[in-house]
């Protein structure tokens, strides 16, 4: 090999540096079409939260929030300016926007603001009963709000005192507070001098500092509990079953606007309670929206924030959009092609962000080919598409690409990563034969366009020989019930439940009970050796239970976030599989929709795609919900939902930013520039250089995206981020590294393929002019013609190079190493 080609002369670098420095992008004018009607109903200008009130016991109360929506969509809290009128003043009263009980019965509270009015029904029970303080319902929430359970929840506690992390063990916490060191932490004779109070109020030295005031409602509740003898709760005490935060969405102005929210818990006995003062509040973006201890939001700079409230085992949140006060904004007349654009635009209008325009035809074609098939269009395909005047040509091209085998290859690769299809060090952990059968089965299912929920159902319920029924390899590649439970939740729901194995999830709804209930579906999976050493028989053993770490009690199977099904005499996996594939499962459709969106848009609506949780909210919840509903409506037809996404204007926008969306990277106002994944990049290099690769177990010329085994790789693939499938993950490793840069510049892959393919020799044999050869190379690599400026710079190079083949070789090398080739844009 002539190694000079691996390092093009400095003149080439000087001439071409400006050409290849960035990614070429372009924009077309916005189409002036009428905007479709919004999918969601316009919100009421005047709203009162909550819409109904239920009060139980003498000390119960419910705060009201009154919200006005101005013409520009900004929300105002007008609670303090509103008038409250109780229909029957003997039943209830309102003080500073808080409804208080007086007598049993029912009445209404009329809320009036200017010419607006709304009536809130109120129901009161046991108004004369002073309910005793509950350890679980009143005291533990105080510990949680003050974050006692965070510091003292460490494995060894803190300063000699230990609580359960995030309150997963109420019984143990009560013991440690009241009886572990008798008389040390509580003083029943003089409750105010109890250590749990003096340390929290700053009256005694405390590593955690002062947590609340001595005369606060929290202190008074603790004193009442101690005065009653610090009792534990009865076994049948009501427990929280859900939590809501109101309002669920806010658009506020910056800086300094305030808005108070309210939080309400519902309990297993049917009651509800205002827990705003007991909830722990958090914000995802303090620079845009700060949150006070009792739910007071104060805006900062422009941006988005997700304000969360945690109470008991539940965490809920509200989306807060903050825009500059007095911002002048006019929404342009732009085309909305489907529900995707309508919902993207709704969010952008709230943010006062204008979407970028459409990309040009060359950019669209290249983007669609890479995303849908993992290939590049040929030069002839580019020229034909650009010359086509059919207004429906983009939609038709998408349909053609969806019917190509390469579309199946891409999704077989992604699902192989989710299912961790890989060989192990021995036959017990996945033989090559089993892995190949597993991959081929998966690819066959996708090629037949079998509904995704049915594929999931067949995998979860798989039994028999892993060689005769390849889906049974789902239980061969992973045998630990704990890992099976975690991997299933992550692969099919996009939920990471790992935290809940040892303690209640700090920032999501999942408890240790939820974790063990989900795990119980996998504790009765039996395995035995088949006749072939590589064969394993998967069956229902009928024995094996999931036990709670606290108390070692058996936890029956329970759907995540759902009911406890009847599994008596049934294969538990079949029960789970039926539920996963059913409309009652709220997770699968949204997760698959998010996977699709992330692949084609470069970022998930929930990002990372396999980390769905309250504290990592969707950037556009309405869009995610609509995509999930469409997927169910389409019977989990993968092609149909991909078609919806790719036909949207949102997918076809340019990557070029405007003044309003320059800093936005999560609301899809412009296309995302992203590097090709490792397998696709290698395949595209081979395609444009007309060379063939040989991968283990595949014929020469097979593409890297077709490799079945996660353990099969090359130096190039490993360097550019090919996954080994050791963990559940479909996120593509596309971050730059020094090894990648060095391999492209000095490695043998690009240089060797240029020499091996003979493209330059072929082009020069056709009596083409230098400009025609350069244009052909550009069409191959960038899928566009070179600009006049680029041609002038190239002429400066080949004009001073004695050997034209060497000049073309160097230009080809530079194109393949350019960002515009390596990135999809």
Kindly give the residue locations of the regions a language model identified.
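N-terminal secretory signal peptides that target proteins for export/translocation
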Residues: 1-18
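Bacterial N-terminal signal peptides
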Residues: 19-34
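Solvent-exposed helix-loop boundary motif
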Residues: 37-59, 67, 80-81, 85-102, ...
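Structural motif
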Residues: 71-76, 267-273
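Periplasmic/extracellular electron-transfer cofactor-ligation site
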Residues: 144-165, 224, 228-235, 496-511, ...
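Catalytic cores of secreted or luminal carbohydrate-active enzymes
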Residues: 212-231, 738, 742-746, 750, ...
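Primarily short, surface-exposed interaction patches in extracytoplasmic proteins
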Residues: 332-406, 417-696, 727, 731, ...
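Long, His/Glu/Asp-enriched segments that create or flank divalent metal/ion-associated functional microenvironments
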Residues: 689, 696-698, 705-706, 715-721, ...
